Amino acid sequence: RAIRSNIEFATKVLPGLDCTKSVVSMLPSAHMYGLMFELLYELSVGAHVHFLSRVPSPKIIMNALAEVKPSVVIAVPLVIEKIYKSKVKPVLEKEGIRFLMKLPVLNQVVLNKVKTELINAFGGEFYEVIVGGAAFNTEVEAFFKRMGFPFTVGYGMTECAPIIAYDD
């Protein structure tokens, strides 16, 4: 019953996923979050699931996202945080960018540029990144909210199949 309830919930919050869309499965299917939102839900709506053929590393994941161009990205916080630390933080720490981030109008220009680069890093065609399976770094989450990045954080546990709460 809990699995069916999670599928019904996912159908409401991810209405754009259908037989014409794709996801990259990078989480282990032994993990309820990965099983539920990278396999069972996709099967229920007929979406294409692309499995990684090797153990996921940042490079393998980024290559898969670029190749598949998924409609939804399902990830654990560690994946998102590694992308943030490797692609975003070095740019934001440059002296000129730090200065621009202090200026009211120009900071939004910088944020929009960073957002575009991040969207492209995730394949460029997704409409949402769903983060769950562990606590999300508050600095990264606050920055993603500030720039208007399309992400959602889910909270849960295996015994609940797995979603308990969903912060949209």
Predicted feature locations:
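Alpha-helix-centered segments that form part of catalytic cores
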Residues: 103-141
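Conserved AMP-binding/adenylate-forming core of the ANL superfamily
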Residues: 1
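Short, acidic/turn-prone active-site loops that include or flank metal/cofactor-
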Residues: 54-56, 156-159
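Active-site loops of AMP-binding adenylate-forming
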Residues: 136, 145-149, 157-168
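Extended hydrophobic secondary-structure segments that form protein cores and membrane-embedded regions
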Residues: 22-26, 128-130
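Conserved AMP-binding/adenylation subdomain of ANL enzymes
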Residues: 4-22, 29-117, 146, 150
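Conserved G/P- and acidic residue-centered "switch" motifs that form tight phosphate/ATP-binding loops
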Residues: 46, 133, 156
